[in-house]
């Protein structure tokens, strides 16, 4: 005779539920264990990972030219539109500032996922500033810096850095709208003026300057200019490489005579280079006139410094060389990229 255990209905239900819960708990534990054992992917920069995952197509430069209405310059996959401010007559300490001395608006197009990233530097008068920055915002672009390049300049001009991202046609259309707003506020096309388009006198001993600075410059309309890249720093903005052609460089523009010269320029520096570069320039009689950023999402952090010096040309060059020696110390200064036309 078999003995049968008869359970009450409530006990039977509880027993069944306990079994179901045990199976569920075991399944959850196994799933969590598998998740914990799965190799983790290091994601220090989501933007950079996004760039790696998405394909990047070459720029449609013909579309940019057609939309913006002017030809640019192509360099290593990037395309730059430059607008010399020939309508502005500016002097600093008796020296005429022409486009080659740092008086040009430019917008650079770089290949990016789904189109292009643009970065630009707009030369604006005080009357231009408000309407142009309104146009930038209305177009959905960003303003990343507003600053001076000179002091004691007449008339006063400001420099506004902008950025944007989208399809090539879209960002080209936005760029054209901003450039058109500048034409509207000025009442003319800055590139077609003749106020600052002429050459200036320059009797500098450029070979002596080259020897002191250890670079070779380029002469443009009486301005002898050096542009020095920073290949020792792998700079990115939103995961996109920022090149010398895109404005990531140190430059120096000389004019005048051997005994009475002027030099204007821009230093690009990492955060640890800022203090020693400023100290060295000032100790060598070169005036620091601005310290600022150009970008806001760059990695690593980069600062830009504008300077102005008047005096004996070779003494100015020695001071600049001493300041250059404060940068790129982790890597040799030899071999840094340079082209006098990288920064227009």
Locate predicted features.
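N-terminal compositionally biased, intrinsically disordered segments and leader/signal-like regions
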Residues: 7, 19, 42-44
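Boundary at the C-terminal end of the N-terminal hydrophobic targeting segment
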Residues: 26-30
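Bacterial N-terminal signal peptides that target proteins for export
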Residues: 2-15
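C-terminal multi-pass transmembrane helix bundles with aromatic-rich, positive-inside signatures
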Residues: 6, 23-25
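Long, contiguous binding/interaction regions
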Residues: 31-156, 163-302, 308-344
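Bacterial N-terminal signal peptides
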Residues: 14-23
């Amino acid at each position: 005779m078999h003995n049968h255990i008869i359970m009450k209905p409530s006990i039977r239900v509880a027993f069944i539920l306990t079994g179901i819960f045990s199976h569920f708990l075991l399944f959850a534990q196994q799933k969590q264990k598998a998740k914990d054992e799965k190799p983790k992917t290091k994601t220090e920069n989501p933007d950079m990972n996004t760039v790696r995952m998405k394909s990047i197509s070459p720029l449609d430069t013909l579309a940019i030219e057609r939309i913006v209405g002017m030809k640019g310059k192509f360099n290593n996959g990037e395309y730059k539109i430059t607008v010399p401010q020939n309508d502005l007559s500016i002097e600093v300490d008796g020296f005429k500032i022409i486009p080659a001395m740092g008086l040009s608006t430019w917008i650079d197009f770089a290949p990016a996922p789904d189109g292009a990233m643009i970065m630009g530097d707009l030369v604006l008068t005080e009357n231009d500033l408000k309407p142009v920055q309104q146009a930038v915002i209305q177009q959905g672009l960003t303003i990343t810096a507003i600053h001076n390049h000179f002091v004691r300049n007449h008339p006063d001009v400001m420099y506004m850095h902008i950025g944007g991202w989208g399809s090539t046609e879209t960002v080209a259309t936005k760029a054209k709208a901003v450039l058109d707003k500048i034409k509207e506020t000025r009442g003319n096309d800055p590139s077609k003026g003749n106020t600052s388009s002429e050459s200036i006198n320059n009797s500098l001993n450029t070979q002596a300057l080259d020897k002191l600075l250890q670079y070779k410059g380029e002469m443009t309309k009486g301005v002898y200019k050096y542009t020095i890249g920073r290949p020792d720093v792998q700079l990115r903005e939103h995961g996109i490489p920022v090149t010398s052609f895109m404005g990531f460089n140190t430059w120096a523009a000389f004019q005048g005579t051997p005994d009475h010269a002027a030099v204007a320029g821009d230093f690009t520096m990492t955060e640890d280079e800022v203090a020693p570069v400023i100290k060295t320039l000032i100790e060598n009689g070169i005036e620091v006139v601005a310290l600022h950023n150009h970008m806001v999402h760059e990695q690593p952090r980069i600062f830009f410094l504008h300077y102005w010096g008047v005096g004996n040309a070779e003494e100015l060059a020695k001071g600049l060389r001493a300041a250059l020696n404060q940068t790129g110390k982790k890597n040799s200064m030899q071999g840094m990229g340079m082209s006098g036309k990288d920064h227009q």
